[in-house]
């Protein structure tokens, strides 16, 4: 079972500093007028996990004209539990905050498993590792967990994207494998049938030749 537990947000869009539990024992209702940053909280979660927000945008620093004087960039930490293991994702953007390893956040992406850094080189490969641990791509996460104003629904996706989503949800890859095996068996049977037909034609010619000889 996958459970998101806690999120810490610094300098993300309109959020200056936020600590929020993600798995309380009760339902949380966040009420505020339009434009006051309700969806920004969820956007921070998505960005921390996938590197792009609810609308697919990766740039999430606070607007320069409204930044506080001590603004140090963006850092979002997300904790989640899967089985017996505890994970922590740290994603930074133009971040001057010094992290636990003694280095500045800058534009770093870090994944920890049971408080040990997952040693994968390169952001793309590390993102693949995060997706694998979650079992959810960005598209599937947005279509199955996140629903908000202005977000594309599954029904609006292209047929190819729908196919990819359904394959991810229902693990339909085995159908493609089975189709490949069936096609290979079919080709083998056709080859055998063609060989039998060829041998039959040769025998027929030989029989006709023998008849003429007698």
Predicted stretch roles:
Residues 92-97, 122-128:
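A short, sequence-level motif marking secondary-structure junctions
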Residues 29, 143-214:
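Extended, Lys/Glu-rich alpha-helical coiled-coil stalks
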Residues 41, 72, 122-126, 137, ...:
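Alpha-helical structural motif
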Residues 14-17, 65-68, 136, 149, ...:
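Generic structural "secondary-structure junction" signal
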Residues 1-117:
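Extreme N-terminal "head/tail" segments of very large remodeling/mechanoenzyme assemblies
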């Amino acid at each position: 079972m996958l459970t998101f537990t806690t999120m810490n947000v610094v300098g993300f869009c309109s959020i200056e500093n936020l600590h929020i539990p993600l798995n309380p024992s009760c339902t949380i209702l966040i009420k505020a007028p339009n434009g006051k940053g309700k969806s920004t909280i969820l956007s921070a979660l998505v960005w921390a996990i996938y590197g792009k927000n609810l609308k697919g945008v990766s740039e999430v620093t606070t607007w320069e004209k409204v930044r506080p004087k001590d603004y140090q960039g963006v850092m979002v930490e997300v904790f989640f539990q899967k089985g017996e293991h505890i994970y922590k994702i740290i994603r930074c953007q133009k971040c001057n905050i010094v992290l636990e390893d003694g280095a500045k956040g800058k534009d770093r992406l870090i994944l920890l498993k049971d408080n040990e850094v997952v040693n994968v080189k390169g952001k793309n490969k590390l993102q693949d590792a995060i997706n694998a641990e979650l079992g959810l791509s960005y598209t599937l996460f947005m279509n199955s967990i996140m629903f908000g104003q202005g977000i594309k629904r599954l029904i609006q996706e292209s047929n190819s994207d729908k196919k990819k989503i359904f394959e991810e949800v229902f693990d339909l890859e085995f159908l493609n494998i089975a189709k490949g095996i069936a096609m290979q068996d079919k080709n083998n049977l056709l080859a055998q049938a063609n060989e039998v037909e060829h041998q039959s034609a040769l025998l027929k010619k030989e029989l006709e030749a023998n008849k003429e000889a007698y």
